[in-house]
From Swiss-Prot:
The gene is rplB. NCBIfam families: rplB_bact. This is Large ribosomal subunit protein uL2. The keyword Methyltransferase does not apply. It comes from Hamiltonella defensa subsp. Acyrthosiphon pisum (strain 5AT). It holds the Pfam family Ribosomal_L2. GO terms for biological process: cytoplasmic translation.
Length: 274
């Protein structure tokens, strides 16, 4: 994998930095594992904007990813690595010994021809999935479940990982990349290693149009709007003379946004500032 800086042949190419991976499959994806992906434009079923700055973008097929990894005791061969337009990580197409194919998130250093497996007592090596009760303390894992059998929810983006730092009773203690330390049931599954394509963070799109291809619309400052559109709008100059707020008048800059009190007991330490 190489990080390539483009030559400044035009203003749109001057600042572009690409991540080139020669190991990725150059053909079409595995069609039975594709499904339709409908664009919402950030609107809900009533047509109201629920997420700003979303709209347009290139058409995409969604790859059905196996986040549960529940085919225990059946070894799988890595047929190929593929690009996935719906996420920052690359995906790997597995061919199981019973003939079934599934997509998984491609861990770091996984290559075409490698073999992976899932189960209670599989080998401790990158790409294998097993319950966290059987993973050694200090190991680095990704694709972590929050509830047994629900499927992975933590550490799924490119280059992300979680470290197991303790085990007590039915729970293991994890340290997340954000600095948060939380407890999760030891029957939850995780995949050994970290997610590949860590160089994703080094890429530079270089122009506004590249954002639009990805379905991301411009973010307009509140001070550039009219008073009817934003609390910061209007007035002479750029000073809005009040505490920063959202377009709906809710305080920003440090206001707590977490409402899920049900799982507060699972968090041992809040995320720390970097």
């Amino acid at each position: 994998m190489a990080v390539v800086k483009c030559k400044p042949t035009s203003p749109g190419r001057r600042h572009v930095v690409k991540v080139v991976n020669s190991e990725l499959h150059k053909g079409k994806p595995y069609r039975p594992l594709l499904t339709k992906l409908c664009k919402t434009g950030g609107r809900n079923n009533r047509g109201c904007i629920t997420t700003r700055h979303i709209g347009g973008g290139h058409k995409q097929h969604y790859r059905l990813i196996d986040f549960k990894r529940n085919k225990d005791g059946i070894s799988a061969l890595v047929e190929r690595l593929e690009y996935d337009p719906c996420r920052s990580a690359n995906v790997a197409l597995l061919l199981y010994s019973d003939g079934e194919r599934r997509y998984i998130l491609a861990p770091k250093d996984l290559k075409k021809g490698d073999k992976v497996q899932s189960g209670v007592d599989v080998a401790i090596k990158a790409g294998n999935t097993l319950p966290m009760s059987n993973i050694p303390i200090g190991s680095t894992v990704h694709n972590v479940e929050m509830k047994p059998g629900k499927g992975a929810q933590i550490a799924r983006s490119a280059g992300s990982y979680v470290q197991i730092i303790a085990r007590e009773g039915f729970y293991v203690t994890l340290r997340l990349r954000s600095g948060e330390i939380r407890k999760i049931h030891s029957d939850c599954r995780a995949t050994l290693g970290e997610v590949g394509n860590a160089e994703h963070m080094l890429r530079v799109l270089g122009k506004a149009g590249a954002k639009r291809w990805r379905g991301i619309r411009p973010t307009v400052r509140g001070t550039a709007m009219n008073p009817v559109d934003h609390p910061h709008g209007g007035g002479e100059g750029r000073n809005f003379g009040k505490h920063p707020v959202t377009p709906w008048g809710v305080q920003t800059k440090g206001k707590k946004t977490r409402n899920n009190k049900r799982t507060d007991k699972s968090i041992v330490r809040r995320r720390s500032k970097k």
